[in-house]
Amino acid sequence: MMASVATTSPMDAFGRLIRDLRISVTDRCNFRCVYCMPREIFGPSYAFVPRDELLRLEEIVRIAKVFAACGVKKIRITGGEPMIRRNLEHLIEMIAAIEGIDDISMTTNASYLSKDRAVALKDAGLNRITVSLDALDEETFRTVCDVEFPVSRVLEGIENARQAGFENIKINAVIKRGLNEHSVLPLARYFHGTGSILRFIEYMDVGSTNNWKLDEVVSATELIALINQEISINPVSPNYRGEVAKRWRYADGGGEIGFITSV
């Protein structure tokens, strides 16, 4: 029998309550972003985890139940690209039924987020969506993501999610010097006043696959100064201790913007 939901959560070494669990449902993705899964490494011959070796949906649910019994409240579904995983909506439906889990979110590139799937995900119990989008202009988008379809497909996915009832959609943009720092202001303008929360992420070291260099990092300090040249933003207090993004708001009431630091 599964243990009852914990009244207190375990803490990490910094005294922060462990309330979130991130579950990667696949290592595959239809994007080949240069800072994450560059094609020269993740090409046709790359050995992804065989599908029959992935955790089955029932195994994922069991893990979620164990963590819920330890005090976890939030589940984040990730990949790769999680929408590649078959029966994703059924998985979310099962997780939503777990006692103690009160928030389920998903990080996606939104390229598969059709109107029907957005509604199905909402109906299954998905609470929040985060979309990865690093540029708005066609050339930079295709260069960064190494895909053959237009950026409008991602923007349509975001709109489909909004129409399905998802609120406060988060937009994550990784900024790399020499690649897409010119996209910062266009992104800030585009999502101003939309209800979406734009979050800029410093270029991060993900091991040996992206040839990370410190001088390619555009710091949060630089990003804030750049945006403030055109659109005034002000810092606000975090929602809770240990929140990942540093929160700011447009001074004119146009919504929230965040910064996630890597160094």
Locations of the language-model features?
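Conserved alpha-helical substructure of the radical SAM core
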Residues: 2-79, 83-102
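Flexible, active-site-proximal loop/turn residues at the rims of small-molecule/cofactor binding pockets
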Residues: 42, 81, 135, 175, ...
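Radical SAM enzyme [4Fe-4S]-AdoMet core and its adjacent flexible, acidic
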Residues: 2, 139, 151-155, 159, ...
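Short beta-strand/turn micro-motifs composed of small residues
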Residues: 25, 108, 261
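Residues that line or immediately flank small-molecule/substrate-binding pockets and catalytic motifs
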Residues: 40, 79, 108, 133, ...
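A short, compositionally biased micro-patch
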Residues: 26-28, 124, 251
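A short acidic, helix-capping loop that chelates divalent metal ions and anchors anionic groups
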Residues: 43-47, 137-144, 207-211
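Radical SAM/AdoMet-radical enzyme domain recognition
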Residues: 57-76, 84-197
